[in-house]
């Protein structure tokens, strides 16, 4: 259905799907030499250029020098722009994983579409067909033009007044996924699997009929009329930008374990570990204002058989993450970072607020971990700047909309700070009035926020039609 709608697709999406393709084999060696952070990935034309060493030019195709006319015509035709290069200078381990995924695609081990969910997301595999990550292309997000699932299309046709989430920027889910991981790292929470922005191309992705026809036509021209085919800038399908999250093994949906824990209560030390992990999930969701956190999209890892003897015989130090016997993984963070609080049809509540764990006040350990960060305005400013560096890589980046997103996030941080100081519980935190903290710059016009900036606090009084509280 998405292919049929392609001719009327917005021009911005059309441009995005028609960028040059990555060199397929020869890029492997340069990547190992200079892998870098996805947050520092170079911006597209028209966006601010990120200041990153050794990434101002497209990477060399071979280890001996840059691309030249003497190289093969195949490399010339697949030469890429720097905006589509998967470089991760600060994380060689992640770079190797992405490289394995690309090499697997080269030999025909394609990403597999995930049947669950309302968007086009894919299990990415290595050459041994082991799942190593989850890729969510921007163009196949829930409200994207190339979403292969019918759920949102039916929603749009049958109930257009409620279609979409009016508080979220459209087609920014991949940045939200990467932004959630950034917040997780900054706060030292350790519950979001590593997630960064990458470019991938695969036949199993959902492309428009036009893109597939052009790809077939170019291949046919190259085969029948090589002189003409060699003039094409790219042979093959265009790469897609999206979020790449490392796959976590041996985890199950929280819904399964929550039911088990009701019937079979946890030992006290394990219960404390779970409570600590749960509080970190609450903090993450609240700061980024996750609008899609149900008990089916966060995971729990707990092998009671494996750890039974250890649980009974030891009083484990549950603060030490290395000895954690139960862990939480916060996945599906693509519907977060709203530019305003939900105030239209639905409230998008935090479903964890109704769990028994949400009635327990935040522990002293959690307060000691989080308060030093979020009560420091320098830390909050630094967090906003890091998110700015990430979000501005999108072609449709809008500075005013980003400032609104940060105003909501600062308001969430303000509420969280007060709740931790007052010893409130997660449920009480979720019931606090919504606040917006806007920044009005004075003097110099910097990137995001300055120490000399003044802030205006506003209570958001408008309630959605279907309110949860």
UniProtKB/Swiss-Prot annotation:
<dbReference type="GO" id="GO:0005524">
    <property type="term" value="F:ATP binding"/>
</dbReference>
<keyword id="KW-0443">Lipid metabolism</keyword>
<keyword id="KW-0333">Golgi apparatus</keyword>
<protein>
    <recommendedName>
        <fullName>Phosphatidylinositol 4-kinase type 2-beta</fullName>
        <ecNumber>2.7.1.67</ecNumber>
    </recommendedName>
</protein>
<feature type="binding site">
    <location>
        <begin position="245"/>
        <end position="248"/>
    </location>
    <ligand>
        <name>ATP</name>
    </ligand>
</feature>
<keyword id="KW-0547">Nucleotide-binding</keyword>
<dbReference type="InterPro" id="IPR000403">
    <property type="entry name" value="PI3/4_kinase_cat_dom"/>
</dbReference>
<feature type="binding site">
    <location>
        <position position="332"/>
    </location>
    <ligand>
        <name>ATP</name>
    </ligand>
</feature>
<feature type="modified residue" description="Phosphoserine">
    <location>
        <position position="37"/>
    </location>
</feature>
<feature type="region of interest" description="Important for interaction with membranes">
    <location>
        <begin position="345"/>
        <end position="354"/>
    </location>
</feature>
<feature type="binding site">
    <location>
        <position position="136"/>
    </location>
    <ligand>
        <name>ATP</name>
    </ligand>
</feature>
<comment type="similarity">
    <text>Belongs to the PI3/PI4-kinase family. Type II PI4K subfamily.</text>
</comment>
<feature type="region of interest" description="Activation loop">
    <location>
        <begin position="330"/>
        <end position="350"/>
    </location>
</feature>
<keyword id="KW-0418">Kinase</keyword>
<feature type="region of interest" description="Catalytic loop">
    <location>
        <begin position="289"/>
        <end position="297"/>
    </location>
</feature>
<dbReference type="GO" id="GO:0005789">
    <property type="term" value="C:endoplasmic reticulum membrane"/>
</dbReference>
<feature type="region of interest" description="Important for interaction with membranes">
    <location>
        <begin position="252"/>
        <end position="260"/>
    </location>
</feature>
<comment type="function">
    <text>Together with PI4K2A and the type III PI4Ks (PIK4CA and PIK4CB) it contributes to the overall PI4-kinase activity of the cell. This contribution may be especially significant in plasma membrane, endosomal and Golgi compartments. The phosphorylation of phosphatidylinositol (PI) to PI4P is the first committed step in the generation of phosphatidylinositol 4,5-bisphosphate (PIP2), a precursor of the second messenger inositol 1,4,5-trisphosphate (InsP3). Contributes to the production of InsP3 in stimulated cells and is likely to be involved in the regulation of vesicular trafficking.</text>
</comment>
<dbReference type="InterPro" id="IPR039756">
    <property type="entry name" value="Lsb6/PI4K2"/>
</dbReference>
<feature type="domain" description="PI3K/PI4K catalytic">
    <location>
        <begin position="108"/>
        <end position="439"/>
    </location>
</feature>
<dbReference type="GO" id="GO:0000139">
    <property type="term" value="C:Golgi membrane"/>
</dbReference>
<dbReference type="GO" id="GO:0005886">
    <property type="term" value="C:plasma membrane"/>
</dbReference>
<keyword id="KW-0256">Endoplasmic reticulum</keyword>
<dbReference type="GO" id="GO:0004430">
    <property type="term" value="F:1-phosphatidylinositol 4-kinase activity"/>
</dbReference>
<keyword id="KW-0597">Phosphoprotein</keyword>
<dbReference type="Pfam" id="PF00454">
    <property type="entry name" value="PI3_PI4_kinase"/>
</dbReference>
<keyword id="KW-0472">Membrane</keyword>
<feature type="region of interest" description="Important for interaction with membranes">
    <location>
        <begin position="149"/>
        <end position="162"/>
    </location>
</feature>
<keyword id="KW-0067">ATP-binding</keyword>
<dbReference type="GO" id="GO:0046854">
    <property type="term" value="P:phosphatidylinositol phosphate biosynthetic process"/>
</dbReference>
<feature type="binding site">
    <location>
        <position position="121"/>
    </location>
    <ligand>
        <name>ATP</name>
    </ligand>
</feature>
<feature type="region of interest" description="G-loop">
    <location>
        <begin position="114"/>
        <end position="120"/>
    </location>
</feature>
<feature type="region of interest" description="Disordered">
    <location>
        <begin position="1"/>
        <end position="84"/>
    </location>
</feature>
<keyword id="KW-0808">Transferase</keyword>
<dbReference type="GO" id="GO:0031901">
    <property type="term" value="C:early endosome membrane"/>
</dbReference>
<keyword id="KW-1003">Cell membrane</keyword>
<feature type="region of interest" description="Important for substrate binding">
    <location>
        <begin position="141"/>
        <end position="143"/>
    </location>
</feature>
<dbReference type="GO" id="GO:0005829">
    <property type="term" value="C:cytosol"/>
</dbReference>
<keyword id="KW-0963">Cytoplasm</keyword>
<keyword id="KW-0967">Endosome</keyword>
<feature type="binding site">
    <location>
        <begin position="259"/>
        <end position="260"/>
    </location>
    <ligand>
        <name>ATP</name>
    </ligand>
</feature>
């Amino acid at each position: 259905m998405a292919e049929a709608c392609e001719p009327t697709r917005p021009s911005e999406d059309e441009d995005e799907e028609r960028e040059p393709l990555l060199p397929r084999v020869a890029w492997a060696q340069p990547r190992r030499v200079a892998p870098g952070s996805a947050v520092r990935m170079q911006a597209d034309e028209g966006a601010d250029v990120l200041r990153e060493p050794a990434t101002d030019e497209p990477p060399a195709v071979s280890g001996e020098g840059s691309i030249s006319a003497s190289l093969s015509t195949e490399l010339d035709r697949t030469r890429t722009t720097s905006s589509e290069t998967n470089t991760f200078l600060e994380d060689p381990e992640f770079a190797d994983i992405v490289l394995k995924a690309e090499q697997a695609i080269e030999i025909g081990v394609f990403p597999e579409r995930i049947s669950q969910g309302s968007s086009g997301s894919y299990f990415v595999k290595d050459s041994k067909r082991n799942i190593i990550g989850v890729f969510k292309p921007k163009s196949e997000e829930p409200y994207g033009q190339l979403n292969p699932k019918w759920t949102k299309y039916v929603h749009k046709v049958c109930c257009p007044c409620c279609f979409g989430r009016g508080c979220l920027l459209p087609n920014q889910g991949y940045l939200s996924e990467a932004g959630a991981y950034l917040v997780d790292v900054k706060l030292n929470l350790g519950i979001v699997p590593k997630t960064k922005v990458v470019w991938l191309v695969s036949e199993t992705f959902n492309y428009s009929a036009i893109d597939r026809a052009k790809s077939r036509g170019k291949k046919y021209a190259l085969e029948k009329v090589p002189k003409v085919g060699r003039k094409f800038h790219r042979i093959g399908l265009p790469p897609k930008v999206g979020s790449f999250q490392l796959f976590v093994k041996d985890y199950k949906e929280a819904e399964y374990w929550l039911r088990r824990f009701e019937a079979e209560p946890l030992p006290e030390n394990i219960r404390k570990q779970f409570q600590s992990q749960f509080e970190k999930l609450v903090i993450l969701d609240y700061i980024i204002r996750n609008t899609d956190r149900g008990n089916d999209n966060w995971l729990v890892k707990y092998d009671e058989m494996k750890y039974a003897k250890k649980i009974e015989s030891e009083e484990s130090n549950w603060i030490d993450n290395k000895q954690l016997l139960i862990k939480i993984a916060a996945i599906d963070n693509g519907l977060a970072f709203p530019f305003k609080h939900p105030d239209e049809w639905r409230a998008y509540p935090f479903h964890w607020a109704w769990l028994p764990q949400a009635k327990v006040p935040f522990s002293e350990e959690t307060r000691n971990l989080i308060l030093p960060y979020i009560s420091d305005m320098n830390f909050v400013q630094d967090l906003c700047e890091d998110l700015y560096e990430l979000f501005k890589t999108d072609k449709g980046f809008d500075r005013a909309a980003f400032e609104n997103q940060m105003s909501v996030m600062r308001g969430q941080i303000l509420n969280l700070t007060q709740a931790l100081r007052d010893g409130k519980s997660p449920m009480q935190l979720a019931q606090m009035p919504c606040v917006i903290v806007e920044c009005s710059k004075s003097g110099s016009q910097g990137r995001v926020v300055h120490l000399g900036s003044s802030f205006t606090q506003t209570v958001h009084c408008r309630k959605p039609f279907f309110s949860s509280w």
